[in-house]
Amino acid sequence: MFENFRVFETEFAGRKMTFETGKMCCQAGGSVLVRYGETTVLVNATASAKPRDGIDFLPLSVDFEEKLYAVGKIPGSFLKREGRPSDKAVLSSRVVDRPIRPLFPKDMRNDVSVVMTVLSVDPDCVPEIAGMIGASMALSISDIPWNGPIAGINVGLVDGEIILTPNAEQRQKSDLQLTVAGTAEKVCMIEAGANEVDDDTMLEAIMKGFAEVQKMVAFIKEVQAEIGKPKFTFESQEIDHDLFEAIKDEFIEDVRAAMDTDDKNIRDERMRPIYDRLHAEYDEKYPEQGAMLDECIYKLQKFVVRRWLLDDGKRVDGRGMDEIRPLDAEVGIIPRVHGSGMFTRGQTQVLTIATLGTIREAQILDGIDEQTTKRYIHQYNMPSYSVGETRPSRGPGRREIGHGALAERALVPVLPSLEEFPYTIRCVSEVLSSNGSTSQASICGSTLALMDAGVPIKAPVAGISCGLITEGDRWMTMVDIQGVEDFFGDMDFKVGGTKKGITAIQMDLKIDGLTPEIIKEAFAKTHKARNYILDEVMLKAIPAPRPELSKYAPKMLSMTIDPDKIREVIGSGGKTIQKICAECNVKIDIEDDGHVFVSAIDIDDCRTAINIIETIVNDPEVGAIYKGVVTRLMNFGAFVEIAPGKEGLVHISKLDAKRVEKVEDVVSVGDEILVMVTEIDQQGRINLSRKDAIAKMEAKKEGKE
């Protein structure tokens, strides 16, 4: 029945990886089931037969589908069904999209869909890597025109040792979470989060991962040669060469004059009459070809910018190749919020607001990832007004989620631990004006906002991008690219880090890959630029985190108790903890490992609650004095609660120094009195003395003790 069923097996960084094809999804253009350890991912690639009209880009969609059955979970929603993709799924889709997109024919406009469905997850074998390699295999053996293959790998750094495909335990300890993708010759995608890793170590990790990637690429080529389908012939949507040359001859001087400014708005304003004149002259001759005419002008702008850079060493705004746009940084500009910072670089401006919350406000993650909660959250918003446009706001898209995650990754390594700073932290970056590198401005703005909020970060972090122009063997890098250099260039290499090292990388390419020399130069230039931004602007705005939190931020104290004592703090039906919260006006969160977090507006309320909890979890000590509440009166004495759930007896003879006839002559139910523990018998019963407590306190006052 399955006469085309084939299984191919190889070793990938010491682990077996198998590819099954010809049994499932036989109507897709290319289909493969990837087995990597016990991780299983089904990957399908399909393409439309006809091109889509009226567009000037490849309509490629890449979807990484998380299925909770893959980790033995039932979705928590009312419908018990997977909903919209999680942020992690979106980020995984983008990681696969970036290396495969540049390898499609530039003049192809057919819809292409790549779907990776996660069927099972082995914690030691990352499904994103299985999906990426599976996507490359599916496209390679399909009938879809594509100039691959590529492959990807995870790289870690544990105790100074570079590790390929680290397992779950190693990933927890790793100072580096690096994903590298490449073709047979070049590195084509880098994404990383790191604990201040130096440039040389990062480059070594990239190249070590790339060497393993090349082996997988060679294997995919062998499979393609054996079972690959012939590629279908598509209708080329390349613009007419003669038409472009005619438009170029007529409009190039006008385009040069329009592009030669550092102001995006002026540039756009200058280009409008050029578009108007183009359509007035050519629409009649080329009816229904408006999109192609616009693409000719776009291509002409690209030609002008690239020739300036490669031939004249000239940037559109007149800067040098390593020169950063004018910078500005401000903090504390928004009242009542917990922290705020605004970072401006040329016409790019980002305002970041930091908010501190309790541990219970941490984000709950319902996905296939090992992580279930997140205490640092960074979100990025780029409204239409930031680029002078009008369009409805429909919530964050893939780009916004990706930029937010990059800035989040850059700051996580410098955040204080939960024990040092028991808060949930949320940063929101609002892009006020955009002309390139808004994600890197978000990193800078987040650092400013966190320091303004009084978060004791280990070191300030700055972000900067590096661009690239290539032509044959010629290439040139430039620091701090603005919009047109991003649009018309070949690379956007984003690097966030401290003075000590790198904390985050994201590399976007429009070419087939980079050589080690280009990567090394990009690291060197971004390192120098980061230090300049920190020293000249950010640290002058705020040299160190504020010593105190905002008066509007919740105050927090934490302690650790024996997990076996948790039930005593909570009490029967939660009565004890509810009583503490009500009496002290606090919120209390208790983790399973015994960590206790107490928050309130007033720090003194936190201290009072902590003292009460300590009396609950610590066994009473003979000779110690406690403030207790009288709970019951008996003929022979009074029962006093010295801590929730801990009650002792004050015998009538121990109520006062003088003789007491009736207990009620001295105390009443509800009275707060000082008592001293005089004895704890073998049955755990506590004997108390008010008389001895008073005597001891008076002796202290007189300095006798």
Task: Go through each PLM region and give its residues.
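Mobile "lid/hinge" segments at catalytic clefts and subdomain interfaces of large enzymes
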Residues: 143-259, 450-547
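Glycine-rich, flexible beta-strand/loop modules in the N-terminal catalytic cores of phosphate-handling
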Residues: 28-113, 118-120, 125, 191, ...
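Extended amphipathic alpha-helical scaffolds
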Residues: 1-48, 56, 233-370, 554-568, ...
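Long, basic N-terminal domains or extensions that often function
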Residues: 1-235
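Conserved helix-loop functional segments at active or binding sites
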Residues: 98-106, 141, 333, 358, ...
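Single-stranded RNA-binding regions, centering on S1/OB-family and related RNA-binding modules
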Residues: 552-558, 563-705
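Conserved phosphate/anionic-ligand binding catalytic regions in large, soluble enzymes, centered on
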Residues: 30-32, 125-143, 331-354, 435-455, ...
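Flexible, glycine/charged-enriched surface loops at secondary-structure junctions
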Residues: 106-112, 147-149, 216-234, 265-266, ...
